Amino acid sequence: MVNQTHEFLLEMTGVSKEFPGVKALDKVNLKVRPHSVHALMGENGAGKSTLLKCLFGIYEKDEGDIIFLGQHVNFSSSKEALESGVSMVHQELNQVKQCSVMDNIWLGRYPTKGFFVDHDKMYRDTKAIFAELDIDIDPKVKVATLSVSQMQMLEIAKAFSYDAKVVIMDEPTSSLTEKEVNHLFTIIKKLKEKGCGVVYISHKMEEIFSICDEITILRDGQWVDTRPLKGLDMDKIISMMVGRELTQRFPEKSNEPKNVILEVKNLTALNQPSIQDISFELRAGEILGVAGLVGSRRTDIVETIFGVRERSAGHILLHGREMKNHDAHEAIRNGFALVTEERRSTGIYSNLDITFNSLVANVDEYKTPYGLLSDKKMKSDTQWVIDSMRVKTPSHQTHIGSLSGGNQQKVIIGRWLLTQPEILMLDEPTRGIDVGAKYEIYQLILELAKKDKGIIIISSEMPELLGITDRIMVMSNGRNAGIVNTKQTSQNEILELASRYL
């Protein structure tokens, strides 16, 4: 049980951090009470990650105080923070996938019997934690067999096993179904009842209003305000985050779909369960949305078109010409581009610079007759990506991993535009990106549509699909349940179609 003598479990006051040429944090405050869920919000690049890295000792703060349970602390590592009672459940989960569930929970502090690990005690202790958190996972199975949501539950159980007083959750629902989100909220409420303070980082407003008690907002590395959520509305939070009233969530649509450029006929993937008998058309200058519940195989469509998933039947015609697209290289040559869902694992090379990340899909274009790379053309194309995509970065040499999520996504879109595609496919293009950056991505997509690109967007966010698409194809259990005109449809009609083949 958490010591109740302190008004705040964690107090970070006046925290500042400067990098060469950039003031990342300027006197930022974060105060977390026991028995509460505290939202930490701000646009990508507002300083949330830097603040938490200062807490966990990954960065050394330049000034400011951190008080935990009434004591001044300066953690030197996340391990020290965890052992002291401050835990973080990351957006990117850190687990040893070839080890068992219970191994992952007790790694580095196994219970022993004499000289040997006491596996029975480890199993019993894991079961006890799972019972308390209502988690139904076999402690002996390998982590590699778990779903993303189960891995997330495992991270929370690990924090619980350390008797964490403060648990920080970074975009915890980004890959969860509605049912799994509800289970997560139940667990958060249990942590709250125990006296924990939960710091909840999310861009999903409905979650913030559903689960949080207080909110701290950062903007451009500065603390804007800390308030109880009661009495606040979405517009007020957005205006505090972006420093201005965001009158529109979506730009004005001015693209005009023209002639049909892509025809997909009876497309079926080889390895089932997957897509079956998918047919649709895409026009030049059209934005086609793909909706569906989790597990409806939306991603399989673009993967099959792009050649990374094998097909057993069907035809793909671009300007009336049959496209085989046996692999991604052939698809790129044929004028297709795919921005994948998992930006961090399959999109960016986080330890490499913006130049590499901008040019990697188009390397052959930079080869001179002597087989060397043309430095001049590489520099000019990287600059084109930065300028045309409006990427905020200190230089070409900046590691892409240090950019905000919105800027990373802009680089990836720019990378694919350098291949001069006719068909641009985007899978969850604004996942984990803040409100202001989303608007910029929408502007880019609409500008591309006005240049007669054919665009396919997969999204789990219904307002996004209704806000920027021309038509929406609804997937249900691997099949096309119907295509609707965006202006004439409703959320209810889309949800009805999404459950047609369940």
Curated annotation (Swiss-Prot):
It holds the Pfam family ABC_tran. Residues 10-245, 255-502 form the ABC transporter domain. It catalyses: D-galactose(out) + ATP + H2O = D-galactose(in) + ADP + phosphate + H(+); methyl beta-D-galactoside(out) + ATP + H2O = methyl beta-D-galactoside(in) + ADP + phosphate + H(+). ATP binds at G42, E43, N44, G45, A46, G47, K48, S49. The keyword Translocase applies. GO terms for cellular component: plasma membrane. InterPro entries: AAA+_ATPase, ABC_carbohydrate_import_ATPase, ABC_transporter-like_ATP-bd, ABC_transporter-like_CS, P-loop_NTPase. Keywords: ATP-binding, Cell inner membrane, Cell membrane, Membrane, Nucleotide-binding, Repeat, Sugar transport, Translocase, Transport. GO terms for molecular function: ATP binding; ATP hydrolysis activity. It comes from the Bacteria. SUPFAM superfamilies: P-loop containing nucleoside triphosphate hydrolases. It is a peripheral membrane protein. Its EC number is 7.5.2.11. Its main location: membrane. It is found in: Cell inner membrane. Part of the ABC transporter complex MglABC involved in galactose/methyl galactoside import. Responsible for energy coupling to the transport system. PANTHER family: CARBOHYDRATE TRANSPORT ATP-BINDING PROTEIN MG119-RELATED, GALACTOSE_METHYL GALACTOSIDE IMPORT ATP-BINDING PROTEIN MGLA. The complex is composed of one ATP-binding protein (MglA), two transmembrane proteins (MglC) and a solute-binding protein (MglB). Belongs to the ABC transporter superfamily. Galactose/methyl galactoside importer (TC 3.A.1.2.3) family. This is Galactose/methyl galactoside import ATP-binding protein MglA. It comes from Vibrio cholerae serotype O1 (strain ATCC 39315 / El Tor Inaba N16961). The lineage of its organism: Bacteria, Pseudomonadati, Pseudomonadota, Gammaproteobacteria, Vibrionales.
